[in-house]
Amino acid sequence: MKHTLVIVGAGLAGLSAALTAVKNGWTVKLVSSLASERAQSVMAEGGINAALNTKGEEDSPEQHYTDTLTAACGLADPNAVWGMTQAASELVRSLHHLGVQFNVTDDDELDLRNFGGQKKKRTAFAQSDTGKQLMTALIDAVRREESAGTVERFPHHKFRTLLLSGNICGGCTVQDTYTGELLRFVCDAVLIATGGLHGLFGDTTGSLANTGEVTAELFRLGVPMANLEMIQYHPTTVELGEKRMLLSEAARGEGGRLFALRNGKPWLSLIHISEPT
């Protein structure tokens, strides 16, 4: 008997989780308030880090681990960072195999570039639209699973609440944003992959659809939470009309500097750090 997983959120995390669950024998119901093509993940520009060592710099997952902990200033979970850095290279290669159009060198190796806080070039990228390329490949893969009957997608459905019996979650309720119909999903597990909370802020480079309402409902239900203060801000933007457009971290990774004025004088200068301190 197959287990059923409901995933709330169909961006990079939700799609990846769906494919992983199917690979491990689960069936998946994939719920999202918008189509995957409009997820925040599509907007990611810069790249994805892994110690692939295609530049002959003698890079390694251990160095990736050390750089990441250093850049985190003691706030990162060492066990989580170790797992991520050990798995990163194989994950990036599997994404390339899945169809992500990463930049490659003349020798047909994955190209790598600098990002902030790392000693070696270890950022794989797809021109300036890495997120879009990642999402395109993952969406295609999930649609193949949908055709096979292992994934059922529910775009334009909003999460409303969990179905709880004491401390046991037995499913969730979602609502069709067009018809208002409520659907009750009974399942073996619910995975929340709804992204950040930046839609709460007046000025953001992210999608305004990321309102944080799912997190708020989970908080109301008493679901244990951690690291809610870890909201990333992006220091390079261009203001166009009412929306802040993101300038990739790659601009700083290649040596670009950021100057902010206070009383007409530069007071903040962020430069690419070739050796984390």
Regions from the PLM with identified roles:
Residues 96-181, 186-189, 193, 202, ...:
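Conserved redox-cofactor binding core of oxidoreductases
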Residues 67, 76, 82-120, 256-260:
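A conserved beta-strand/loop capping segment in the N-terminal third of enzymes
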Residues 200-217:
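A conserved FAD-binding loop/helix module that cradles the flavin
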Residues 50-84:
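Glycine-rich active-site loop/strand segments that organize a redox cofactor
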Residues 11-12, 35, 129, 197-198:
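Residue-level detector of alpha-helix initiation sites
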Residues 5-30:
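N-terminal Rossmann-like FAD-binding beta1-loop-alpha1 element of flavoenzymes
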Residues 23-44:
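Glycine-rich FAD pyrophosphate-binding loop
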Residues 217, 223-274:
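An anion/pyrophosphate-binding glycine-rich loop and adjacent beta-alpha core
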